[in-house]
Amino acid sequence: MGLDMYLYGVKQEFHKHDYNIGGYKESTEIGYWRKANAVHAWFVECCQNGVDNCATYYVGHEDLKALRDRCEDVLLEPERAEELLPTQDGFFFGTTEYDDWYFDDIKETIEICKWALAQDFDYFEYHSSW
């Protein structure tokens, strides 16, 4: 058990000529974190309106850019990590220390965001469970 976090890239297609058919949504898992509670706290605050309920939430391109930028700021000023991207405690959420594990999660988040933003997804979705 523990905090598992997923980012999905979504392509959405609508049938323009037959509105009775609607369309489809294709989701692809493009990011996974385990117990990266600071990143999870950012998604809860910025994309989930503060609601932490293991549901799936919309994430826009601008949201991912903001997360990427915040993580880059943390790496540039690690002494401000607690202010810029604070950890979050919780049952099964892992450590709240600003240690090598924390900074590895930050680096991984930057890579996930960069890759995701370079793709042709219409939007993204974030889901967590514990």
Indicate residue ranges for each PLM-predicted region:
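Acidic (Asp/Glu-rich) sequence patches and key acidic residues
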Residues: 1-130
